[in-house]
C-alpha cells in the first residue's frame, strides 16, 4: 500500500516543475511556449463554457438544448478566431477546418464532445475541443496554418454522453456513418424525438442528410482526441499527460430476479424464494470473478496467457443500480432488478467472463428456486489505438513536458481507457490516437472535476508539437 501522503507530494512536485521555463526548449516546441494562448486563454474559455448551462446551480448541457446551442455558437466563434473555416452539420456537430497547403490531401481530425452529463464538470469533452482550437490558433498567429501538409479539422461533437436520448455517440456516430436511421425517432422523457429536437433549432435532418454527414474513410488519415483521464493513474504517477493504447470494450446487462413475495415475519427461512438473497449471491460472485478471472476461468496456459494478463489488468465490473419491489422493510421482495457494467480490453475475455457469470447465475437461481432473466442492453467492442499515431503523440507529449519543466522527461505512460470516447465511433473509419490529461483525484462526471491550468497548457503544447510535425 502506498503512503497516503505520497500522491499529493508527487503532484505538488510535478506542479512546481511545470511552473518552470527555460530560455531554450525542445526544437518541436515554440520558444516562448505560447502561454497566453495555450494556457491563459484556453483556461478562460473552459471556465466560460462551464457557465453555459440549462440548469441553475449546476452544469447541465444535453443534446440540442438552449445551452447546447449557445455553447456551439461560442465554439464556432473561437474556431473563426483561430483562422478556421467553420460550419455546423445536420446533427449539430461544429466543424472548424484549416485547408493547409494541400486541401485535397487526407485530413487529420481532432475532436471531442460539448454535451455534458447532469451536474457535470467543465473539462470532460470540452478540454479536447479547446486545446485543439488553441493549438491551431498558435499556428495561425505565426502564419504557418496554411503551410500544413494536410488539412486539419476540429470537430466538436454534439452528443457523446447520451443523456437526453439514451443513445451515446450521436455526433461521432453520424460522422463515422454508424448511426442507425432509426435513432432519429428515439424520444426523450418528454416524448420529443431527435428529429424534433434538431428541428426546434432550425436544423433539418433526414435519412439522406444523415448519409451526407458521413465522412469517407478514404478522405481521413487519422482521428486524435485529447481527454481528461477520468481516473487516478496519472495523478498517482505525478505526470500531467499519458497516451492511450486502447479503449475497453463494454457490455451492459439488466438482470431481473423473480421470487415469491411474502411477509417478513411469517415465512420461515427454509421455505423462502427470496430474489434479494439470490441477487446478492450473484453480485458477490461477479466481484470475485472480476477480481480473480485467472482462478475462476479455464484457459489454455500456452495460447491464452497474454490474453489472460490483458484481461486481468483491464477487467472491471460494476453493479451500479439495484431496484426492489415492493421495497418495504417488512416484505420479502417479489422482484429484484440490477444492472451490470462489464469492461475489458480483451473482447474474447469479456465474453468468457459473461459466459461464466451466466452459468453461475443460472445455478444460483435454480438452487434458490427463483427465476432469472438477463437483457443485454449494450455491447461495444474494444478499440486499439494506432501504434504510429500513438508513438507520435507520445513523442509530442514527452517533448512538451521537457520544454515546460526544463528537466529530462524519459517518457509518458501508455494507458488503457476504461471509459468510452468518441474515438470508439471514429475508429470505424480511421486510425485513432488519444492523449490523456491528469484530473484531480481521478474525479469526473462531477462538479469536483478539475484540471490544473498548467496541465491544460501541457496538453495544448503537446498537441501543438504534434501538429508542427505536419509543417
Predicted regions and their residues:
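Active-site-adjacent substrate-binding region
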Residues: 36-39, 191-245, 283-287, 291, ...
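His/Asp/Glu-rich mid-to-C-terminal helical/loop segments that flank catalytic regions of hydrolases
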Residues: 245, 263-293, 354-359, 437-471
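Cleavable N-terminal signal peptides of Sec/SRP-targeted secreted and luminal proteins
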Residues: 4-20
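A short beta-alpha structural unit
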Residues: 60-64, 316-328, 339-345, 371-390
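Acidic/His- and Gly-rich active-site-bordering loop/insert found
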Residues: 22-32, 36-120, 139
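Midchain, well-structured core segments that form catalytic/ion-binding scaffolds
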Residues: 159-160, 164-348
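Alpha-helical metal-binding/catalytic segments enriched in His/Glu/Asp
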Residues: 110, 119-160, 251-257, 263, ...
Amino acid at each position: 500500500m502506498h503512503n497516503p501522503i505520497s500522491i499529493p507530494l508527487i503532484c505538488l512536485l510535478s506542479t512546481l516543475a511545470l511552473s518552470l521555463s527555460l530560455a531554450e526548449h525542445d526544437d518541436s516546441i515554440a520558444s516562448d511556449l505560447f502561454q497566453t494562448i495555450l494556457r491563459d486563454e484556453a483556461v478562460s474559455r473552459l471556465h466560460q463554457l462551464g457557465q453555459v448551462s440549462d440548469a441553475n446551480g449546476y452544469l447541465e448541457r444535453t443534446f440540442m438544448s438552449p445551452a447546447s446551442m449557445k455553447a456551439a455558437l461560442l465554439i464556432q466563434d473561437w474556431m473563426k478566431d483561430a483562422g478556421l473555416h467553420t460550419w455546423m452539420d445536420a446533427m449539430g456537430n461544429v466543424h472548424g477546418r484549416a485547408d493547409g497547403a494541400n486541401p485535397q490531401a487526407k485530413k487529420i481530425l481532432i475532436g471531442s464532445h460539448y454535451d455534458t452529463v447532469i451536474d457535470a464538470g467543465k473539462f470532460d469533452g470540452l478540454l479536447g475541443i479547446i486545446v485543439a482550437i488553441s493549438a491551431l490558433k498558435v499556428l495561425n498567429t505565426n502564419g504557418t496554418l496554411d503551410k500544413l501538409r494536410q488539412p486539419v479539422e476540429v470537430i466538436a461533437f454534439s452528443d457523446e454522453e447520451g443523456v437526453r436520448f439514451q443513445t451515446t455517440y450521436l455526433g461521432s456516430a453520424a460522422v463515422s456513418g454508424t448511426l442507425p436511421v432509426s435513432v432519429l425517432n428515439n424520444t426523450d422523457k418528454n416524448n420529443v424525438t431527435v428529429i424534433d429536437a434538431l428541428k426546434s433549432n432550425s436544423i433539418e435532418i433526414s435519412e439522406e442528410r444523415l448519409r451526407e454527414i458521413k465522412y469517407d474513410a478514404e478522405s481521413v488519415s487519422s482521428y486524435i482526441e485529447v481527454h481528461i483521464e477520468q481516473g487516478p493513474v496519472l495523478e498517482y504517477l505525478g505526470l500531467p499527460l499519458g497516451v492511450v493504447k486502447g479503449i475497453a470494450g463494454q457490455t451492459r446487462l439488466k438482470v431481473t430476479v423473480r421470487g415469491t413475495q411474502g411477509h417478513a415475519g411469517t415465512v420461515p427461512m427454509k421455505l423462502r424464494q427470496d430474489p434479494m438473497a439470490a441477487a446478492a449471491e450473484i453480485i458477490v460472485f461477479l466481484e470475485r470473478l472480476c477480481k480473480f478471472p485467472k482462478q475462476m476461468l479455464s484457459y489454455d496456459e500456452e495460447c491464452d496467457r497474454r490474453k489472460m494478463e490483458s484481461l486481468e489488468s483491464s477487467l472491471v465490473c460494476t453493479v451500479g443500480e439495484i431496484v426492489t419491489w415492493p421495497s418495504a422493510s417488512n416484505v420479502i421482495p417479489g422482484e429484484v432488478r440490477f444492472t451490470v457494467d462489464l469492461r475489458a480490453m480483451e473482447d474474447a475475455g469479456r465474453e468468457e467472463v459473461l459466459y461464466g457469470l451466466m452459468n453461475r447465475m443460472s445455478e444460483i437461481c435454480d438452487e434458490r428456486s427463483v427465476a432469472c432473466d438477463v437483457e443485454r442492453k449494450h455491447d461495444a467492442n474494444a478499440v486499439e489505438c494506432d501504434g504510429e499515431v500513438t508513438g507520435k503523440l507520445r513523442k509530442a507529449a514527452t517533448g512538451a513536458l521537457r520544454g515546460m519543466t526544463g528537466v529530462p522527461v524519459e517518457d509518458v505512460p501508455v494507458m488503457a481507457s476504461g471509459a468510452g470516447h468518441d474515438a470508439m465511433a471514429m475508429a470505424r473509419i480511421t486510425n485513432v490516437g488519444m492523449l490523456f490529461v491528469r484530473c484531480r483525484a481521478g474525479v469526473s462526471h462531477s462538479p469536483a472535476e478539475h484540471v490544473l491550468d498548467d496541465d491544460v497548457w501541457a496538453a495544448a503544447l503537446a498537441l501543438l508539437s504534434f501538429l508542427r510535425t505536419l509543417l
